[in-house]
């Protein structure tokens, strides 16, 4: 096949491209420049699209003896990922920019360009597995559970999955991937992993939000409406947060308090005891299917597990898909700190079967 390999400059994408070539594919490499200010990003930065990353991507392609190009996707990334990130926080929601990037940049814009240029598939260094099942392609967790990225890939949908290659999905550990790079003499074999939001180079998410959304003083109140502190912008807080509250009045029982919610209209943050974060029902919208629409799993006929943050816990549940794309989940065990805006992925075993965006999480009344 004619394969377009996305090279980020890291070890994972370099090894994935090498494996694709060694599998007999005709591989061309591309580095996606996602930052409009790449030259300002210093070497060793924690952010994306540093000069060092672009240089490492070019070096990897040269060592693998494959053609290399740089595609400027900064405008698309800014509009669909960064602006979405800011807009979601303006609404008091908790977005996952990696999900949006995969949806709009890596597996939409990149795939569209690849298809127009006659490529048969796109290859990346993501940790996930694409398996051909009885009814078509399926997305499964990677064998290396610690690095599994199926959660942020489920938004792709089945059609996009038909034209991707994830060579690293079968590896049991990241150390094995680094060993593959070392065997091939790739110098990025020891390059550290990146865990932060890629466009926030210093890792200071609150500072980034403040610089773009500004500051506005507001109240922090308890569940009875009593003021217990102040803040400089309700958008800076997410459900379940405990650190950084700086409450002026301790709770009567002396217990720690957590963010229970925000009211963006009144710029108010509500805090309370940890047990008030517990929920047993979730409503999500804009469902993306990775299975057949009539799959009985989506009508509550099988126990599934839910994941609502990257590398988060798996929660047993039953789910019900409605005709308008709304997904209702009834949790078989309560969970906590579920925020609107997060991506909800439904798994049957290690297979992802549906993704949707959380609108509401709540505690059902007894007998409901």
Report the location of each language-model feature:
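AMP-forming adenylation/ATP pyrophosphatase catalytic core
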Residues: 11, 123-368
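ATP-dependent adenylation/nucleotidyltransferase module used to activate substrates
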Residues: 1-155, 174-176, 182
């Amino acid at each position: 096949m004619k394969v377009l390999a996305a090279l980020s400059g890291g070890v994972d994408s370099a090894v994935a491209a090498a494996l694709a070539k060694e599998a007999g594919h005709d591989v061309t490499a591309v580095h996606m420049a996602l930052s409009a200010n790449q030259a300002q990003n210093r070497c060793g930065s924690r952010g994306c699209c540093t000069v060092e990353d672009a240089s490492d991507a070019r070096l990897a392609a040269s060592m693998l003896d494959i053609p290399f190009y740089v595609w400027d996707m900064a405008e698309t990334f800014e509009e669909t990922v960064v602006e979405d990130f800011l807009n979601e926080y303006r609404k008091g929601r908790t977005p996952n920019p990696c999900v949006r990037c995969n949806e709009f940049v890596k597996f939409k814009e990149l795939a569209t360009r690849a298809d127009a240029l006659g490529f048969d598939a796109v290859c990346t260094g993501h940790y996930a597995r694409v398996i051909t099942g009885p009814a078509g392609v399926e997305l499964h967790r990677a064998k290396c559970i610690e690095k599994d990225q199926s959660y942020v890939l489920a938004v792709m949908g089945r059609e996009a999955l038909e034209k991707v290659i994830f060579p690293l999905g079968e590896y049991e550990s990241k150390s094995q991937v680094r060993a593959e790079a070392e065997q091939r003499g790739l110098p990025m074999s020891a390059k550290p992993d990146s865990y932060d939001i890629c466009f926030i180079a210093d890792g200071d998410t609150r500072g980034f939000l403040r610089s773009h959304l500004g500051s506005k003083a507001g109240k922090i109140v308890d569940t009875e409406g009593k003021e217990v502190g102040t803040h400089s912008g309700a958008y800076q807080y997410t459900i379940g947060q405990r650190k950084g509250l700086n409450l002026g009045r301790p709770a009567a029982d002396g217990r720690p308090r957590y963010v229970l919610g925000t009211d963006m209209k009144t710029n108010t943050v509500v805090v309370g005891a940890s047990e008030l974060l517990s929920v047993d029902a979730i409503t999500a919208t804009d469902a993306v299917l990775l299975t057949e629409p009539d799959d009985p799993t989506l009508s509550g006929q099988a126990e599934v597990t839910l994941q609502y943050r990257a590398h988060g816990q798996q929660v047993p549940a039953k789910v019900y898909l409605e005709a308008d794309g709304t997904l209702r989940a009834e949790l078989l065990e309560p969970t906590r700190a579920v925020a609107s805006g997060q991506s909800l992925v439904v798994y049957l075993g290690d297979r992802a079967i549906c993704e949707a965006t959380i609108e509401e999480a709540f505690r059902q009344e007894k007998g409901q």
